[in-house]
Amino acid sequence: QDRHADRRPFLLARNRIKAAIRAWFEAEGFTEVEPACLQVSPGNEAHLHALATEIAGPGPAPTRRYLHTSPEFAMKKLLAAGEEKIFAFTPCFRNREHGPLHATEF
């Protein structure tokens, strides 16, 4: 059995739900933003653990970056810069969270 065929109804339902939510936000005057997933710092939340990655470059050593645990900080910077009504559909990543109630990416 094709795994994609089994999941297709969920993909289509998710797409319809996101489209309806997006349409509501746009009708209310919100702007959709795409905050960067990679950041310089893992964050200050002691109970959240960011996933680290190494970015290879022309320099002698790779650069360490972290996948965000939440888009909140990036979105707050946009609000501080003058944006008033924003929303985002973006994945979040948390290390050490995996089980029946938690996923590393959500």
What are these regions (language model features)?
Residues 1-106:
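Class II aminoacyl-tRNA synthetase-like tRNA-binding/catalytic domains
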